[in-house]
């Protein structure tokens, strides 16, 4: 945890928070924080700054928070990824978020096993936890946009252009020996096909 990610439910006053659970255990057991210890903090989908531990017990930690700086900008990259195996899905999601990708679309295609869509890793709680862990790692409090599309052809024909906006669209293809386009890197939508 490189940044303490705070949610509105943590606040017990205008600039005071109380945390428990995983985030508290990280401060208490791993960092061994004591009153006066400073750490980076960010408010979910809001500003970043710092926090100072004011009280810590085996069950919870209280901190004073000062978050007034704007969050770091996202990379000008959007991803469209064929839905990978469930074990790989959370790794792909985590890696993309830690690299600053702000928009990710997971897509159905012919080689995607239909059973992947019923995996418990695609339910809200594992998604939320993976996203929060990735945001804590990269010190960015802004939740990326993650969408799922079950139909390949309608997405490519009807939504891809609006999803990509004015960005250039690149398709990562394993059979092409040509290097990627040269020149300045601007907004890019990168399409990544299925495993195998």
In which residue ranges do the predicted regions lie?
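N-terminal positively charged helical leader segments and presequences
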Residues: 1-69
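A short acidic, often aromatic-flanked loop/helix-cap motif at beta-alpha or helix-coil junctions
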Residues: 12-13, 150-157, 177-179
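Short connector loops at helix/strand junctions that flank enzyme active sites
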Residues: 48, 58-60, 72-76, 99, ...
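RNA substrate-binding interface of SAM-dependent RNA methyltransferases
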Residues: 70-170
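Short secondary-structure boundary segments
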Residues: 43, 108-109, 173-176, 194
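A glycine-rich beta-strand to alpha-helix segment
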Residues: 174, 182-196
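A short acidic-Thr-Gly-centered motif at the start of a beta-strand
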Residues: 162, 180-183
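Structural motif
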Residues: 3-4, 16, 38, 61-62, ...
């Amino acid at each position: 945890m490189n940044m303490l990610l705070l949610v509105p439910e943590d606040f017990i006053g205008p600039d005071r928070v109380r945390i428990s659970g995983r985030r508290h255990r990280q401060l208490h057991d791993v960092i061994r924080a004591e009153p006066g210890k400073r750490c980076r903090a960010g408010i979910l989908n809001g500003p970043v700054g710092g926090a100072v531990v004011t009280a810590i017990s085996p069950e919870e930690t209280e901190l004073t928070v000062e978050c007034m700086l704007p969050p770091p900008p996202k990379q000008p990259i959007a991803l469209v990824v064929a839905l990978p195996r469930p074990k790989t899905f959370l790794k792909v999601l985590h890696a993309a978020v830690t690299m600053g990708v702000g928009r990710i679309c997971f897509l159905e295609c012919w080689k995607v096993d239909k059973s992947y869509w019923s995996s418990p890793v695609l339910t809200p709680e594992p998604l939320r936890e993976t996203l929060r862990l990735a945001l804590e790692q990269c010190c960015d409090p802004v939740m990326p946009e993650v969408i799922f599309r079950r139909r390949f052809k309608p997405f490519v024909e009807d939504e891809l252009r609006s999803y990509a906006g004015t960005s250039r669209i690149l398709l990562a293809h394993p059979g092409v020996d040509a290097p990627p386009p040269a020149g300045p890197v601007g907004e890019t939508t990168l399409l990544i096909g299925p495993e195998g």
